[in-house]
């Protein structure tokens, strides 16, 4: 446990002033300077947007970028009133899960893997793209190809991580398509929980009841949900294990 999955240059710390227009956040640096950072998470970020909260940002040296800062993490209080850092950059989720697969941390569930491909067209009309398409090694007793959809998960109630935190038509469609892959292929939904305080995972029924129903239907049909938890630090992210459903 606590394997380092990704390392990066130390992030820049500041304080959240406000988040607006979905993609933007004003952040005060430790020097007192206020900068505008890009926010890759376009969702409501339920339970996270507290003005005055500590945040961390990466900075790009590219002169082509209009906004050099990218908002990466925010510090919130967990159910025990203790600080926990939450990864809010949704673009990180697939990077984390690919690393986890490459490090064989999911082998007990998916078996040994021969190849990993990203963004592969699938579905009846081939207009959808699956996050990861895996082929098993010949030693893998399950010879079926593996389709993996990844969902970034930040919302918490108590010690339970929840997805989604708002109505998601796209997420509903993904569940239907994952179900249709069964039994010819192995169908997996990975919940990338970007905070260390989750003990369980449940679908976010309060935010999207239909998603919850589709989740349970797909699960009953053979879809495999894997809630993967991570711990976020100033210069790295560690593996925090697979959490059970609740």
UniProtKB/Swiss-Prot annotation:
Under the heading Gene3D superfamilies, the entry gives: 2.40.50.580, 3.40.1350.60
Which GO-annotated molecular functions does the record name? Answer: DNA binding
State the Pfam families in the record.
SfsA, SfsA_N
Q: Which family does it belong to?
A: Belongs to the SfsA family.
Which PANTHER family does the entry link to?
SUGAR FERMENTATION STIMULATION PROTEIN A
Q: What is this protein called?
A: Sugar fermentation stimulation protein homolog
The encoding gene is sfsA
């Amino acid at each position: 446990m606590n394997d380092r999955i990704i390392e990066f240059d130390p992030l820049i710390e500041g304080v959240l002033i406000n988040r607006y227009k979905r993609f933007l956040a004003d952040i005060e640096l430790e020097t007192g300077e206020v900068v505008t950072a890009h926010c890759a998470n376009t969702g409501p970020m339920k339970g996270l947007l507290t003005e005055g909260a500590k945040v961390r940002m990466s900075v790009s040296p590219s002169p082509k970028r209009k906004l050099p800062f990218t908002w990466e993490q925010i510090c919130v209080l967990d159910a025990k009133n203790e600080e926990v850092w939450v990864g809010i950059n949704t673009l990180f989720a697939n990077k984390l899960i690919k690393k986890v697969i490459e490090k064989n941390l999911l082998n007990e569930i998916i078996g040994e893997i021969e190849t990993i491909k990203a963004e592969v067209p699938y579905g009846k009309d081939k207009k959808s793209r699956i996050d990861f398409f895996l082929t098993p090694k010949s030693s893998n007793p399950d010879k079926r190809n593996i389709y993996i959809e990844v969902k970034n998960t930040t919302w918490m109630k108590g010690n339970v991580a929840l997805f989604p935190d708002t109505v998601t038509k796209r997420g509903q469609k993904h569940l239907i398509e994952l179900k249709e892959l069964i039994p010819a292929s192995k169908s997996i939904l990975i919940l990338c929980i970007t905070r260390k305080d989750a003990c369980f995972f449940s679908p976010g029924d309060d935010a999207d009841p239909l998603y919850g129903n589709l989740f349970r239907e797909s699960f009953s049909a053979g879809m495999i949900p894997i809630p993967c938890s991570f711990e976020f630090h100033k210069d790295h992210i560690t593996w925090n294990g697979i959490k059970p459903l609740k």
